Amino acid sequence: FKGVYTVKEVAAAGAYTIHDTMAVLTDANGAEVKVTMIQRWPVKKAITCYREKPRPFKLLETGVRTIDTVNPIVEGGTGFIPGPFGTGKTVLQHAISKQAEADIVIIAACGERANEVVEVFTEFPELIDPHTGRKLMERTIIIANTSNMPVAAREASVYTAMTIAEYYRGMGLKVLLMADSTSRWAQ
């Protein structure tokens, strides 16, 4: 929605389908808008629902002291981990996933080797979230497309991850989105 709306009515507590009207809003011109539980999130279209994008100012605590000190990342900002094969980029990604101050962690494994994707799926369910003491997978979403999958699937994996991240960000949650490996995705 764009603009200012007033809530006219809200459905009573109960069981509803996604097509039932949950609320009725009125805009500044008096036009009514019915709100259902259906949501549409375009994958390749820019989000334009905010009037002005706020500038990032708060540091993201990754939990990895060297990154927080030498190469700090702001919440809402972008960071990258360059390096050749076998230098520990994925290990660092796992450490950041585990330690970062985020409500939701989204990992897009795009174009990764199959053994690396299998490693993620076997290790992540065993990791414990140090902030809650529960399984890390309870707040993690993994989208995996290996290097032997079609190029279109690799491309879609990052866009899908971004769309999911925007959904949770729109709910007011802190989202950590990581794509591994963007060089293979760019190919």
Summary of predicted features, one role per range:
Residues V70-P84, V91, A95-Q187:
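Switch/coupling sub-region of P-loop NTPases
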Residues V7-A13:
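A structural micro-motif recognizing beta-strand termini
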Residues F1-V7, I18-G83, T90-A95, P130-M149, ...:
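P-loop NTPase nucleotide-binding/switch module
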